[in-house]
């Protein structure tokens, strides 16, 4: 790897609908806008940011597997897979890449089934309830952590 940090941003199911899907919960910012802002932030930090959004669990898992050996950190909004996917958990454990779990809404203030995450206990940290800003905070936290370890 080069001297730049390589960070992978993963977004799970239905996040492609951001901006129009339940904006009272998720806001009016689109995923394209979030990613564009993060790319600009990453460029200013000399970070290589890759992004994938998928509604398919296996596509996210395959991308996590591909990250092994060439990615320093993962930022993931697993969306509904948060509450259901042991497979995503196993993939993240398998590649041993540190990650931060991101949620736009405060999952703890929502329906009880959204309170459990299969990922949070193995994550470096969890950011929830801060809307699109949560992505910016996660990127900054990842870079801070990577900088301290180098």
Curated annotation (Swiss-Prot):
GO terms (molecular function) for this protein are: 3-dehydroquinate dehydratase activity
> What Pfam families does this protein map onto?
DHquinase_II (PF01220)
Catalytic machinery residues: 26, 103
Entry binding sites for substrate: 77, 83, 90, 104-105, 114
Which UniProt keywords are present, listed alphabetically? Amino-acid biosynthesis, Aromatic amino acid biosynthesis, Lyase
Q: Which InterPro entries match?
A: DHquinase_II, DHquinase_II_CS, DHquinase_II_sf
Per the record, the GO terms for biological process are: amino acid biosynthetic process; aromatic amino acid family biosynthetic process; chorismate biosynthetic process; quinate catabolic process
Top EC group: lyase
The UniProt site entry described as Transition state stabilizer is assigned to: 21
Question: Is Zinc-finger included in the keywords of this UniProt record?
Answer: no
CDD domains recorded: DHQase_II
Q: Under which pathway is this protein filed?
A: Metabolic intermediate biosynthesis; chorismate biosynthesis; chorismate from D-erythrose 4-phosphate and phosphoenolpyruvate: step 3/7
Superkingdom assignment: Bacteria
- State the Gene3D superfamilies in the record: Dehydroquinase, class II
Catalyses: 3-dehydroquinate = 3-dehydroshikimate + H2O
The EC number(s) attached to this protein equal 4.2.1.10
What protein family does this chain belong to?
Answer: Belongs to the type-II 3-dehydroquinase family.
Subunit text: Homododecamer.
| Free-text function comment from the UniProt entry | Catalyzes a trans-dehydration via an enolate intermediate.
**Protein name in the entry:** 3-dehydroquinate dehydratase
The species this protein was found in: Yersinia enterocolitica serotype O:8 / biotype 1B (strain NCTC 13174 / 8081)
Q: What is the lineage of its organism?
A: Bacteria, Pseudomonadati, Pseudomonadota, Gammaproteobacteria, Enterobacterales
């Amino acid at each position: 790897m080069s001297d730049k940090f390589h960070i992978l941003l993963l977004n799970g199911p239905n996040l492609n609908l951001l901006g129009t899907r339940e904006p009272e919960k998720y806001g009016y910012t689109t995923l394209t806008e979030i990613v564009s802002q993060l790319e600009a932030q990453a460029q200013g930090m000399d970070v290589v940011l890759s992004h994938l959004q998928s509604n398919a669990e296996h596509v996210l898992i395959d991308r996590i597997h591909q990250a092994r050996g060439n990615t320093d950190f993962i930022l993931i909004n697993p969306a509904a897979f948060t509450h259901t996917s042991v497979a995503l958990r196993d993939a993240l454990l398998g590649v041993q890449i540190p990650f931060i779990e991101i949620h736009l809404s405060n999952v703890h203030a929502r329906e009880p089934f959204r309170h459990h995450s299969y990922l949070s206990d193995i994550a470096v940290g969890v950011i929830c309830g801060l809307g699109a800003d949560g992505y910016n905070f996660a990127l900054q936290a990842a870079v801070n952590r990577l900088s301290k370890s180098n």
